[in-house]
């Protein structure tokens, strides 16, 4: 008996020792870091979780084309990113990630007020508005607020069980939106920087009926799409997708993709950008059958929100062109992005990318930025709203046609 007790005691002490010897897996963003970059200090930028005073937001540094104006429209929403506009255009809802809130901004005719709709959720990044209801998507929860635009005390309906959410957090902070078909579109990113997803439920885009029924997988091979919109004429879905990290400053670029039919494969994790095989995750003919991107958005640019412009305020040349927000890199030695670009697609299907709004990134060496633009929304009057996740603000970009010069007498 004493021998058995001694063995049991020895085993009890040995088990913790063995568990302590087992190294912890690296955080998801660290995965795929090559030995050649072992000493790199690059890491994701820390977001600001406190309110930024209006006077500390240097909106005057923003640069837009002649005739356009960028101004501070609302502030006081730390971490605010994806936006959903109410049916009447008088309220804007913003999701967040780490801070766990959803905000409501009310436009009372020149003055905006901000309130928190819901708090203490796990990365409620996804917000969508449809037929008077606000939908909120967190990592592990889906809530629907009926009639919230007219009733600030509206209580949520829990739809979580209807949407079959996978458990992993990484790349599953969601952008969600209703399409022209009335369906609710939801992406499910890869739970890693670079890996073969553990199950088929990752790395895809799905669509559902508004109540969560009718689940359909419409795209696979999607690493991390956090922005999409439908072309106003073709009704095709266009979406941004982040390229993998730890591939150097000239590494795999972010993508602008177009879904022309249900079931297309966009390559992840075997094939990236314009047909580049992954150096670690390999298979025979990795790019065979993969749909190539319409345009490349730059390496590590963090291409986020996209909006096809259909308003009447901007000059005609902007009609049916796309605005895409690039939040800005962290996995490059030389910063890239931190801007809004305008994308125009020719009759040949080729896209050209032009700068539109800049100024968030400061000059000089290293990462010196005061803001990080994230998403774009179109208002009923045709103005654009751009959210800034870093300072918790929304900017309004408007256009006024220059007045004709007075004729000389």
Show the residue positions of the predicted features.
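Beta-propeller domain segments
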Residues: 22-65, 173, 190-193, 208-213, ...
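Beta-rich catalytic cores
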Residues: 69, 76-79, 98, 113, ...
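Surface loop/turn motifs at the tips and blade-to-blade linkers of beta-strand repeat domains
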Residues: 72-77, 115-121, 159-168, 217-221, ...
């Amino acid at each position: 008996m004493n021998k058995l007790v001694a063995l049991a005691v020895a085993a009890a002490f040995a088990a913790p020792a063995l568990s302590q010897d087992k190294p912890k897996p690296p955080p998801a963003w660290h995965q795929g870091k090559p030995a050649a970059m072992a000493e790199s200090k690059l890491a994701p930028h820390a977001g600001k979780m406190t309110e930024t005073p209006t006077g500390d937001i240097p909106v005057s540094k923003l640069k837009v084309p002649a005739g356009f104006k960028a101004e501070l429209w609302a502030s006081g929403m730390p971490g605010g990113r994806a936006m959903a506009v109410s049916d009447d255009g008088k309220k804007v809802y913003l999701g967040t990630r780490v801070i766990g809130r959803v905000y409501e901004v009310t436009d009372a005719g020149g003055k905006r007020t901000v309130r928190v709709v819901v708090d203490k959720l796990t990365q409620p990044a996804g917000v969508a508005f449809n037929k008077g209801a606000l939908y909120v998507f967190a990592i592990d929860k889906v809530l629907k607020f009926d009639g919230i635009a007219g009733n600030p005390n509206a209580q949520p309906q829990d739809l979580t069980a209807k949407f079959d959410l996978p458990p992993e957090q990484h790349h599953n902070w969601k952008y969600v939106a209703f399409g022209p078909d009335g369906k609710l579109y939801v992406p499910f990113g890869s739970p890693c920087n670079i890996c073969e997803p553990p199950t088929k439920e990752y790395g895809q885009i799905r669509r559902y009926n508004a109540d969560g029924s009718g689940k359909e997988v419409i795209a696979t091979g999607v690493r991390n799409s956090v922005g999409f919109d439908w072309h106003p004429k073709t009704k095709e879905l266009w979406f941004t997708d982040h390229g993998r990290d730890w591939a150097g400053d000239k590494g795999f670029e972010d993508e602008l993709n177009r879904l022309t039919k249900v079931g297309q494969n966009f390559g992840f994790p075997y094939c990236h950008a314009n047909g580049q095989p992954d150096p670690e995750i390999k298979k025979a003919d990795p790019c065979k059958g993969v749909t190539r991107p319409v345009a490349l958005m730059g390496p590590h640019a963090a291409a986020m929100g996209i909006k096809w412009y259909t308003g009447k305020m901007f000059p005609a040349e902007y009609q049916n062109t796309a605005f895409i927000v690039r939040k800005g890199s962290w996995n490059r030695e030389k910063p890239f992005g931190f801007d809004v670009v305008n994308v125009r697609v020719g009759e040949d299907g080729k896209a050209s990318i032009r700068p539109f709004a800049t100024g968030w990134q400061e000059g000089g060496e290293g990462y010196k930025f005061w803001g990080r633009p994230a998403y774009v929304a179109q208002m009923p009057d045709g103005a654009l709203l751009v959210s800034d996740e870093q300072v918790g603000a929304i900017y309004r970009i408007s256009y006024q046609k220059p007045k004709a010069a007075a004729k000389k007498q």
